[in-house]
Amino acid sequence: MFTLKKPLLLLFFLGTISLSLCQEERDADEEEGEMIEEEVKRSLLGTVKDLLIGAGKSAAQSVLKGLSCKLSKDC
């Protein structure tokens, strides 16, 4: 019985270490994936923001042109 305890203890110890290393690597991969998702979200939000700003500028320009036309009565 004593002869089986040492190898089993060694296997348990090595298994625990390898499991711990795998868990650390998995956590690192998940953090990297979260960073990539944040970058994609930021780039999408930046693109949408730029489109909305451009649309707002063009709408404001057309409103101002219409107002200036009505005020100067050159329409």
From Swiss-Prot:
Subcellular location: Secreted
Keywords: Amphibian defense peptide, Antibiotic, Antimicrobial, Cleavage on pair of basic residues, Cytolysis, Disulfide bond, Fungicide, Hemolysis, Secreted, Signal
Alphabetized InterPro entries for the sequence: Antimicrobial_frog_2 (IPR012521), Frog_antimicrobial_propeptide (IPR004275)
Tissues/organs with expression: Expressed by the skin glands.
BP term (GO), one: defense response to Gram-negative bacterium
Domain of life: Eukaryota
Presence of the UniProt keyword Secreted in the record: yes
CC per GO annotation: extracellular region
Main location: secreted
Signal peptide (residue range): 1-22
Record carries keyword Signal: yes
Disulfide bonds: 69-75
Proregion residues excised on maturation: 23-40
Function: Has antimicrobial activity against some Gram-positive bacteria and fungi but has no activity against a range of Gram-negative bacteria except P.faecalis. Has antimicrobial activity against the Gram-positive bacteria S.aureus ATCC 25923 (MIC=19 uM), B.licheniformis X39 (MIC=37.5 uM) and R.rhodochrous X15 (MIC=9.5 uM), is virtually inactive against E.faecium 091299 (MIC=150 uM) and S.carnosus KHS (MIC=150 uM) and inactive against E.faecalis 981. Active against the Gram-negative bacterium P.faecalis X29 (MIC=9.5 uM) and is inactive against E.coli, P.aeruginosa and S.typhi.
Assigned protein family: Belongs to the frog skin active peptide (FSAP) family. Brevinin subfamily.
Record's protein name: Brevinin-2HS2A
